[in-house]
């Protein structure tokens, strides 16, 4: 089994529970306030590690108490932290609203995540042997995302981009990506196509492949996901669960996918891992606290 390297954000998540989302200009009363570790990078690293992958993290935390707390979370999950720098200033913070239906809205203040440089990424990758997969997202600077994909590809790794949030990714960057994994909203921003229907999402996936990506996977929430390569396409059904909080579902999906691929499974089986992990993450509150274990995933897949 090769190493999964996650290049991405580490955040403190401040989660507010609401009865309903406020309208613009409206004040509503929250029910709960909780603090959790998060950030798409950390979430995906933990998701993969809990499913049995060997994981190394590359990123940055602040010089505040939150930075030390986040580093402790990384190491407590068995994730290598040699590539996580401590920089002056605050750590990244996410403000998350979750209503009673489990739907969420998220605002991210990058903090230390904005100080991850391409040189940091390249140097950290050069120190890691036997890299199977390099996974990154849109919560670190674009130049660092590009370094992760280009250097990862040069080292013979499979490169995976979760373009969340959707930035102005250059075509040259996408050509260095083996698998791109947006949700339907991010896919619409990346392609300019209407992805609100199944047909639209399929068209967006084909468009991303035409730009040079080997495989495009578009997640569609409760409607599952679709995928396309140059040779074929298909759908990824959901596993039946009762959702409580959808905050880390996409990150769990990514973690399930890379854990399966790093273990040597084919794409079709990796899709099942991804769907199961994503579904299980919706059954618990919070980001990192909701990420499933290997035994939980295997139980759901065998059900």
What are these regions (language model features)?
Residues 73-88:
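A glycine-rich helix N-cap at a beta->alpha junction
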Residues 121, 131-203, 222-225:
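Conserved beta-alpha-beta core of the PfkB/ribokinase-like small-molecule kinase fold
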Residues 1, 167-173, 198-303:
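Conserved phosphate-binding/catalytic region of the ribokinase-like
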Residues 1-60, 65-76, 242-244:
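Glycine-rich phosphate/adenosyl-contacting loop at the front of the ribokinase-like
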Residues 78, 114-119, 159-166, 237:
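Short gly/ser/thr-rich secondary-structure transition/capping motifs
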Residues 60, 86, 96-133, 138:
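Conserved phosphate-binding/catalytic loop of the ribokinase/pfkB sugar-kinase fold
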């Amino acid at each position: 089994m090769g190493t999964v390297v996650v290049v991405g954000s580490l955040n403190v998540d401040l989660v507010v529970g609401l009865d309903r989302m406020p309208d613009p200009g409206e004040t509503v009363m929250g029910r709960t306030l909780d603090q959790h570790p998060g950030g798409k990078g950390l979430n995906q690293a933990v998701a993969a590690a809990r499913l049995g992958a060997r994981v190394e993290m590359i990123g940055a935390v602040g010089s505040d108490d939150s930075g030390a707390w986040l580093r402790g979370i990384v190491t407590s999950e068995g994730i290598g932290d040699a590539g996580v720098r401590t920089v002056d200033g605050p750590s990244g913070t996410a403000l998350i609203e979750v209503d009673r239906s489990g739907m969420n809205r998220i605002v991210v203040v990058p903090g230390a995540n904005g100080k991850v440089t391409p040189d940091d990424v390249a140097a950290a990758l050069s120190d890691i042997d036997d890299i199977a997969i390099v996974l990154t997202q849109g919560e670190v600077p674009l130049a660092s995302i590009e370094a992760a994909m280009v250097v990862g590809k040069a080292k013979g790794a499979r490169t995976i981009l979760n373009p969340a949030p959707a930035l102005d990714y250059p075509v040259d960057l996408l050509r260095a990506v083996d698998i791109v994994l947006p949700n339907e909203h991010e896919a619409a921003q990346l392609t300019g196509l209407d992805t609100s229907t199944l047909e639209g999402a399929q068209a967006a996936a084909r468009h991303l492949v035409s730009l040079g990506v080997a495989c495009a996977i578009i997640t569609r929430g409760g409607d599952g996901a679709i995928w396309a390569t140059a040779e074929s396409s298909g759908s990824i059904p959901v596993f039946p669960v009762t959702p409580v909080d959808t905050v880390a579902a996409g990150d769990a999906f990514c973690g399930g996918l890379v854990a399966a691929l790093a273990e040597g499974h084919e794409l079709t089986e990796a899709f099942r891992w991804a769907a199961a992990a994503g579904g299980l993450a919706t059954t618990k509150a919070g980001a990192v606290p909701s990420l499933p274990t290997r035994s939980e995933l295997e139980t759901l897949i065998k059900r």
